[in-house]
Amino acid sequence: MPNKSSATSMRSGHIAPVVLTILDGWGHREENINNAINNADTPVMDALWQAYPHTLIEASGADVGLPDNQMGNSEVGHLTIGAGRIIQQELVRISNTIRSKKLDQITNLSNLANKLIETDKTLHLVGLCSDGGVHSHINHLCGLLEWAKNKGIQKVAVHAFTDGRDTPAKSSLQYLKIIKEKFEVLGIGELATLCGRYWSMDRDNRWERIEKAYELLTNPNYPLSELSSDEIITNSYDSSITDEFLEPIRLTPSYLKDGDGLIMFNFRPDRARQLIKSITLPSFSEFKRKYQPQLNVVTLTQYEMDLPVSVVFPPESLDNLLGQVISEHGLLQYRTAETEKYPHVTYFFNGGIEQPLPGEKRHLVPSPRVATYDLSPEMSAEKLTKSCQEAIESGIYSLIVINYANPDMVGHTGIHAATKKAISTVDKCIGKILDSTGKMSGTLLITADHGNAELMKGPDGEPWTAHTTNPVPVILIEGEKRKISGQGNQIRLREGGGLADIAPTLLEVLSLPKPDAMTGSSLIETIQTNSKTNLVQQHV
C-alpha cells in the first residue's frame, strides 16, 4: 500500500494542484538586441517576475550532465527536471568511451565488424554531422571511422545529415571538411549521400519527409549528382536553402544493400525513430517501400523498445523520479504538450520509460501541419491551454505538467518577428493557466528547459537557430492551499540552482519527502520576518 501524505487530505474536496509550466526555449539574456523575448509583448511574465519569488537557474553544461559550455536541449532538460539530479548524458557517456579507446571492447560492434569482413559487405554510418551535441556529435562519427579502420573494415560509406538547426544555418562545409580529412588520414571511407535533417529527422509523423530520405538510402536507381558536395551546398545557399533543408543528394553509388551493416550514430531518440523504423520494421506501413534491404543494424542508443536493432549504449535505469514519487503516494498527475514536445513531458520526464505511471494521465495536442513554425507561431498553444485549464479545474490532479513549444520551435527558424509573436502567444496563455490555478488555490511554478528565443542572431549577424547556454527563469506563485510562507515568514528562491533543483522544489510544495536519490535541493528559502534580524532557512 503506497504511503499517504498530507497532500491527500485535499481529496475530501477539490485538490489544489501544483502546476509546472515549462516554457521550451525561454532563456534569459539582459541585452535587448536580437532578443525576441525582451522585444515581445509579455505583460503577464513581466508582472509575475516583479511580484513573486523568482530566480535564474542553469540549464546547460555540467549542470545538466553535459560537457562544460555545451548548450542544453529539451531531452536533457526534461530528464534533469524529472529526475531531480544531474545525470551523465549520452553525449558524455559515448565521448568518454571513444576517448578511452574502448569501442573495440563492445561486443555487438565487434560482431558487426566480423560479419562485414567475412561477407565483404559495406558499413554505412548514418547520422547528423555536426558538433551541435544535441542529437549527435561529429567526434562520434570520427571515432567510429577509427574503430572501423582498426577492425579492418574496408568498405565504409557515410550518409551525412546536414544540421543548420543546432548549429549556424550555413555551417555544414566545415563539418564535411573534417569528415573528408578523416577519410584521407585513415585511408577508408567515402561521403555517399547528403540530406538536410528536415527530411531525415522528422519527429512529427511527416512521413513524406522520411520517405525522401529512405529513397535516397535504398533506391539503387537514385540519380547521382555530377557536382561535388561543396558545390551542392554552395549552390543551395545561393538559392536560399540552408543546411537544415538541403535536398537529398547521392554522391556515390553506395546505397543500402542486403547484408550490409548500418550504424546510426545519433544518440537522441526522438528524431531518429521514424527513419530507423522505416529501415528495420517488417510491418512498417507509413509509406510504400519498393526496396527493403535486409541489414545488420546497430544504433548507438535505444531509440525505442522492441526495435530489431542492436544497441551499443543501452539506457541506464533510473528510479525515484518526480513522477514516480507522485504515483507511489497515490496521487494523480497530468502531462500535456503538443506533438513536438509530447515525448519530453512523458518519456524523457519519466527517465526514458514509455509506459505511463499509475495515476498518470497524458494528453497530446497535435501540432499544426506547416512546413516551418514561423508560418504558424501560435502553434497549438490555445488548444493546449484549454485542455490544461480543464485538468487544473477538474480538481483531481496533484501535479500538472505542461510544455509550451513555441519559443523553441519558432526560435529555431531564426525569424525574429515570428518568434516575438510566439512569445506573446505563450505569455497570454500563461495568464489563463494562472487564472485557473488561482481558482483552485493551487501553486504555479514557471520555468524553462533551455535557452533559445533570447538570441536570434549570432556574432556574424546571421540568424541564430540553435539553443544557448544562458540561464532560464523560475517563478513561484504560491496558492492559498499550498502556502509555505505564512505568519511571520515569507519565501524567496535562492540563486545558484539548476534544473535538477526543480523536482525537490515541487516536492516541498506538495509536502512530499524527497528521495535520497534526488541530489538536487529545493530552491525555496524561508525568510523569518518576526524578529529584528531576518533569518534565512534553506529547505533541503
Curated annotation (Swiss-Prot):
The keyword Flavoprotein does not apply. Mn(2+) 1 binds at residues 408, 412, 467. GO terms for molecular function: manganese ion binding; phosphoglycerate mutase activity. Pfam families: iPGM_N, Metalloenzyme. Keywords: Glycolysis, Isomerase, Manganese, Metal-binding. NCBIfam families: pgm_bpd_ind. It catalyses: (2R)-2-phosphoglycerate = (2R)-3-phosphoglycerate. Belongs to the BPG-independent phosphoglycerate mutase family. PANTHER family: 2,3-BISPHOSPHOGLYCERATE-INDEPENDENT PHOSPHOGLYCERATE MUTASE. This is 2,3-bisphosphoglycerate-independent phosphoglycerate mutase. Binds 2 manganese ions per subunit. Catalyzes the interconversion of 2-phosphoglycerate and 3-phosphoglycerate. InterPro entries: Alkaline_phosphatase_core_sf, BPG-indep_PGM_N, Metalloenzyme, PGAM_B_sf, Pgm_bpd_ind. Monomer. The keyword Manganese applies. Its cofactor is Mn(2+). Its EC number is 5.4.2.12. Mn(2+) 2 binds at residues 24, 74, 449-450. It comes from Prochlorococcus marinus (strain SARG / CCMP1375 / SS120). The active site is at 74 (phosphoserine intermediate).
